[in-house]
Amino acid sequence: MQSLSDIPPSIYLFSCPNCGRSISTYRLLLGSVCNICLEEDKEYKNIGDLIKDIEKQGNLIKLKDIQRVLDDYESFVSVFRRLLGFPPFGPQKSWIYRLLSGESFAIIAPPGLGKTTFGLISSIYLYLRGKKSILVFPTKSLVRQAIDKLSSYIQNLAEIKENPPKVIYYYSGMSASERKEADEGLQSKTFDIFISTNRFLIDNIDQISSTSYQFLFVDDVDTALKSSKSAQAILKLLGFTPSDQDKIKESLKKYRENTQKNEQNEYIFEEIDKIRKDRLASKTVIFSSATLNRSNPILTSLVGFKPGSSVIYIRKVYDMYVKQPDKEQETFNLIKSLLHRLGDGGLIFVPVDKKQEYIKRLQSELSNEFNVAAITSTSATKIDDFANGEIDVLIGSATHYGILVRGLDLPWRVKYSIFVGIPKFKFRLGEKVNLLTLSRLLSLIALITKDQEVIYISRRVKDKIRRLSPAALTMLSVQAKEGKLEDSILLKAYDLLNKYLSNQNVLKRISEIGDFVLSPDNDILIPDYLTYVQASGRTSRIYAGDVTTGLSILLVDDFNLFRLLNKKLQYILDDIQWRELDVEKWTAGDVEIKNLISKINEERNEISKLKNEGNVAPALQKVKTVLLVVESPNKAKTISSFFSRPSIRQIGNMRVYETVLGDKVLMVTASGGHVYDLTTQDMGIYGVDIMKQNSSLVFIPIYNSIKKCENNHQFTDFFESNKCPRCMTTKVRYDSLKSINVLRNLAVEADEVLIGTDPDTEGEKIAWDLYLALRPYNSNIRRAEFHEVTRKAILQAINQPREFNVNLVKSQLVRRIEDRWIGFKLSSILQTRFWPEYCKSLSSNKQLNCNENKNLSAGRVQTPVLSWIVDRYTEYQRNKSRVYYGKIDQLQDIVIYVPKQDGVRKNSKIVVVFNEINQLEEEFGPLPPYTTDTLLSDSNNFFGLSAPETMRIAQDLFELGLITYHRTDSNRISNTGISVAENYLKDVLGDKYTNIFKPRSWGDGGAHEGIRPTKPIDVEQLRLLIEEGELELAKRLTNNHFKVYDIIFRRFISSQIIPLKVRKEIVKIELYGENKKEKINSNQNIIEVITGITLPGIDTEISKFAYVPVRNVSRSVAERLKELGRSIPTDFSIEISNSFIKSTVNLYTQADLVMEMKNKKIGRPSTYATIIGTILRRGYVLESLKTKKLIPTRLGVEVNKYLNENYGRFVSEDRTRKLLQLMDMVEAGQEKYEEVLKQVYEEINEIR
């Protein structure tokens, strides 16, 4: 970042962290407060030092709460250090801060981050503050461990050694004396710390819930929420009544209804928040777990947070494959060979189609040479023996809910996995499949057939699966196989499945898009890719801030199925890399297996050492808590879901998603876009103060927070202190200052703050404003830049943050001030001078208010664009004439157009002579990937979508991680993008893809790319992934979303293949009167017909992925004439059926305007849609319903005339273009922003 002297000055109203007065950029950059709170210009690196200096001055106001928490934090750290010998590290610091702030929250984090230690030390610290604690653990062994740890801590702390807390505890198997002491302590309520199992809590909830306490720590919340009974026990312990729960149920129902209607939900959050605050006023609740497979919506709403899951998609697994031998004994021998060389710590997964008998035979065969055990629901205790090293290798089923697949988290023990075949779903036609497969196949059938009954039943089945536990799903699947199923929805689902799978056409379509293989025995095989990810992921876990290295070896029993597995894995893992294992050479590609195993063993030994010594401090030192701020909630939700199912904190109206990235605990939240804008108060020149300094002008923009009223009007400044200036309501539903205050508190918790707003000038300005607002609270703030919302791009942005680009900020500042000055100046003239005169001329309308019209506006770019529309309409009117037309009966799709002339009228007959037909083949394309202007143009031309609507859709697709950044004028495609095209074509065409694949970068290097898909998924596959629930998006997609995605995908794929071959026929014609004596004049001397489009080298239907901007492909005219028994020359008599008015000049469409702005260089990717939207919204232009042509209104014509006659030189096309070029030079650091603003300032002073 540049020096302070080069930073553009600004004033932020109501933004001093301490007093809420105005504060300058300079003071915020120092990490300080306003000069009223502190006179000295001093830089601060942390908020603690800042608070101390303010307190010395006796001026501490709003920062008192943070001071209290920081003081308590120091006391807590002192206790922590004395107990453990080292201070808290990484996420523990954030947990402590949140606890001391009185926040209830969930800790969902992998082993080794000190969750239990934190809970125990918290109870001791709170005892020192006179507060009682209840700690709940899932098993008696964990209760005993907690008691032992707590006892040793108490002995190590001098100030409580003589007066220790009274600790009572319960677990099965206690001695009679211990039980008696615990009963007495619980009945008399004289304990300080109470520890019990979850089971005891449920059985004795009435007695325990009557006890007053201040801290509840629930370890292994997954167990605590295992049943509704245990969830109810926790709710009762927290003090929530059945009435509270009924209110929450009703509120959640309202929330769902409002969301579907797109109505406001803020008041619902307020109602829930009120209940929560009433019940938890004096309590802090912390849920802790390594995993979470279930949650309770009532409980999560009441406590104000939603636990997540550490089902981590961050993995460091070497994925290898080798062909599985055909014979069973040869397979067993191969596995033995692998085990001898890999050693202990292995998991062997057997696909479910091989049945339990296969597992028994495999166990028996291996037991002769290795210490192995097969795991089932009845032998799960053997996992403990494996964890302790008494068993070397475990064998289990490769099924999504298998014990080894989901119930194992042993990073110190598990080193590798072997899959004896591809995990799969296998069934025969007519067989009762398991519920997960049933749901997937119904989704496919619904997508293909559009049968409303199937769609309805499919959704009901999905809902059931989401609600049911793994055990319940297994039970229902067994009932279905045994013919004992009674559930009417599921029975209907199976009937529909069998009905459609017996239809060969449906079966064929399913096989085309549904990713399954039909085996020689007519079995349907579907790769179970989620099971592969989960099972292989057991070998690569997070422990104490590190992701362990793992090895996965897949014995491939079907290479077609392997191809489908890999395709599916690419959807959820950005860059999985398969290496073929050479067992004899003991290598896989460039990997020496011996070296890899050595590395894995070293890691496991280090983890075991950390675990046994209980000292994870060195490892935790590198674990950081990172706050990532983006603009939109959708983007925040999408990003957080890349790494696990995140836990959710609800703070006011803001959601904070928390997830784990190995050495980082990531908090992701959204600012809601811009948080500041220029004030509309009477300050300076339209919100910009101007000072003279050393004979130069200094421009100081004055910013205020952004507000929104209940009617969704956006503004910065109230009218009469509390009213929306547009509609005068006093109900304000949003003020960005509230969001800023939440972000400030989060910044105190974090070790690092990253701001990941959009990668353009607007995004940089949002990031800059947030940086300044947060700087006093955290000095470690940087910019995270990414051009696509994918796991890989986000990780790169987080791990390689950059400094803020002040030149981009300056450029945006110039754009905004120029827009404000010229806009406010000319708009006020239109509203107060032009309107009264224009209004009076509309004498027929007496209802109009002719004093002032606030809806009128003018702008630097807006006005030239309006001029184009008006001028084009004038030319259109001048060149209008009538055109007649008729169809050739024998060739219905050929229409003949005839200009108005003597002898041509409706119902008259003419003769069309076909003189010659020439057939030719032309190349089409490839066209480059979309830029903003070409996307807006095609979207308007193909679908009639407006520019603003297309930009909203593209923004959604970007934020949901489906396309790259959409505000771009670059065609460049990165190597990552090229690989997306290659992977897709390889999947669709197999080895033939090389016949058409021709990678192109379309430009030199740089950060920006053309608009492209982020994954090798066409629109049909996208619909299927969403319908199956395999791709869960933060927002529901509409048909228009799919349409826009489809053309983006096609245009991109076409940019990476050879040109299309387009077959055409050119028919030369002449027109005559009915008697064939008089020749008729016509502009139509030829008929051009496209008869085919192909890609040489493949025989696959190209319409699935190729960009073909041709709506109709017709049958050959020559062939049709031959069928009619005609030869060239030949003639047809036609009747003129109708006519219409046509001009030789076409009116503009929105697509045309975008291209015009691009070509004339007076627009930007970020402004095209806004400019067109403003012109339409002001009523200057109307858009025709059918043809989507833009027609100026009388108001638009008069506004254009008035502006050009009186202020033409300020809003001319040439002046606008030159000013935009200057702004680009500011962005590139080639022009001083002050000089550009000086020019604009001098200009507006000339406007009278």
Swiss-Prot record:
Catalytic activity line of the entry: ATP + H2O = ADP + phosphate + H(+)
Subunit relationships: Monomer.
Domain Toprim: 625-789
Native source organism of the sequence: Sulfolobus acidocaldarius (strain ATCC 33909 / DSM 639 / JCM 8929 / NBRC 15157 / NCIMB 11770)
Induction section of the entry: Constitutively transcribed during cell cycle.
Family label: In the N-terminal section; belongs to the DEAD box helicase family. DDVD subfamily. In the C-terminal section; belongs to the type IA topoisomerase family.
Cofactor field: Zn(2+); Mg(2+)
Keyword Iron attributed: no
Other facts noted in the record for this chain: This enzyme is the only unique feature of hyperthermophilic bacteria/archaea known and seems to be essential for adaptation to life at high temperatures. It may play a role in stabilization of DNA at high temperatures.
Residue span of motif DEAD box: 219-222
SUPFAM superfamilies: P-loop containing nucleoside triphosphate hydrolases (SSF52540), Prokaryotic type I DNA topoisomerase (SSF56712)
Binding residues for ATP: Q92, A109, P110, P111, G112, L113, G114, K115, T116
Protein name (Swiss-Prot/TrEMBL): Reverse gyrase 1
ZnF bounds (RG N-terminal-type): 7-44
E.C. code: 5.6.2.-
Residues noted as binding Zn(2+) 2 in the record, renumbered to the chain: C709, H713, C724, C727
GO molecular function: ATP binding; ATP hydrolysis activity; DNA binding; DNA topoisomerase type II (double strand cut, ATP-hydrolyzing) activity; reverse gyrase activity; zinc ion binding
Listed GO biological process terms: DNA topological change
Region (Topoisomerase I): 621-1248
Binding site for Mg(2+): E631, D758
Localization, UniProt: Cytoplasm
